């Protein structure tokens, strides 16, 4: 179970990411300051929600989906789930709506159920890189760190300079006790976007690093 402190950080990360692109799936990471564990895929990746524009999975930007994204950005997860569900009722092949609902569901406390939706989104549109990021985040919330890292790596295969996927891997290594790798990846993220410094300095992933000389140099403590 995620502690209150961690959840607040996760929520902050997601909200910051969402601010970049508007939701969990059509967003841009590298230019925005985001918290590291709750960033939505859309924001963090900067890829459009669907790379297969002519497929059945093509996202229908209906009012329910737009409202769901807005609710997700505001931290109103129950409303985001409700609106995304309404969007899915209108279009059962709406990959983006499944991804938004999955991420909102995970942030609302049911990561296992959220993972079902993000997997469904992947089945509908396997080319949606934004959903790769959401998958990584949902796995992370569920505590499946190796699986989470694999999905961050899938994002980086498409966008090697994706700040928050690089940072996400850094936090995973930190949580797994791989200190050198954690700092190596943190350094990579900071080189891409220096705003990562303030995020890392505040997040509990790196709390035990606050007396580490290299960490202090990297984040400016």
What is the predicted role of each segment?
Residues 27-53, 191-221:
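Terminal, low-structured helical/coil segments at or just beyond the last alpha-helical repeat
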Residues 100, 134, 168, 202-203:
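Canonical tetratricopeptide repeat
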Residues 20-22:
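C-terminal motif of bacterial Sec signal peptides marking the signal peptidase cleavage site
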């Amino acid at each position: 179970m995620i502690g209150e402190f961690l959840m607040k950080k996760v929520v902050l990360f997601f909200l910051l990411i969402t601010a970049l692109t508007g939701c969990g799936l059509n967003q841009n990471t590298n230019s925005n300051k985001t918290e590291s564990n709750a960033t939505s895929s859309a924001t963090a990746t900067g890829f459009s929600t669907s790379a297969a524009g002519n497929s059945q999975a093509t996202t229908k930007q209906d009012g329910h989906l737009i409202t769901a994204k807005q609710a997700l950005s505001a931290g109103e997860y129950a409303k985001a789930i409700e609106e995304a569900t309404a969007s899915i009722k209108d279009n059962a092949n709406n990959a983006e709506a499944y991804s938004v609902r999955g991420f909102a569901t995970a942030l609302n406390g049911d990561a296992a159920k959220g993972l079902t939706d993000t997997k469904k989104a992947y089945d509908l549109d396997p080319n949606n890189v934004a959903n790769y990021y959401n998958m990584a985040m949902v796995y992370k919330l569920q505590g499946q760190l190796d699986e989470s890292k694999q999905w961050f790596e899938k994002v980086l295969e498409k966008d090697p300079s994706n700040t928050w996927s690089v940072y996400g891997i850094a936090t995973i290594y930190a949580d797994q006790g791989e200190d050198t790798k954690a700092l190596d990846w943190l350094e990579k993220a900071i080189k891409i976007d220096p705003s990562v410094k303030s995020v890392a300095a505040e997040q509990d992933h790196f709390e035990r690093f606050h007396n580490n000389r290299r960490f202090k140099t990297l984040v400016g403590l």
